[in-house]
From Swiss-Prot:
Tissue: Expressed by the venom gland.
Residues annotated as signal peptide: 1-25
Subcellular location: Secreted
Record key words, sorted: Antimicrobial, Secreted, Signal
Protein name: M-poneratoxin-Dq4e
Propeptide: 26-39
Predominant location: secreted
Gene Ontology, cellular component aspect: extracellular region
Organism: Dinoponera quadriceps
Role of this protein: May have antimicrobial properties, like most ant linear peptides. In addition, when tested in vitro on the parasite Trypanosoma cruzi (responsible of the Chagas disease), is able to moderately reduce the number of the three forms (epimastigote, trypomastigote and amastigote) by inducing cell death through necrosis.
Length: 69
């Protein structure tokens, strides 16, 4: 199954939003969990940011190319 760059970027952004909401819920429940959840989210972002930036750049190029046609 071949996924478009838009579909992949949308899925990644949705996953980040879900993780952010989980971190926020943990922060409300417990201050210690807040620091741990944010650290986990930062680790996840540092691990995946290159892929996300690449996909977003490809989406931008695809959008520019589509607009030019």
């Amino acid at each position: 199954m071949k996924l478009s760059a838009f579909t992949l970027a949308f899925a990644l952004i949705l996953m980040m939003a879900i993780m952010y909401n989980m971190a926020e819920a943990a922060a409300l429940a417990d201050a210690d969990a807040d620091a741990e959840a944010i650290a986990g989210l930062k680790d996840w972002w540092n691990k995946h940011k290159d892929k996300i930036v690449k996909v977003v750049k490809e989406m931008g190029k695809a959008g520019i190319n589509a607009a030019g046609k």
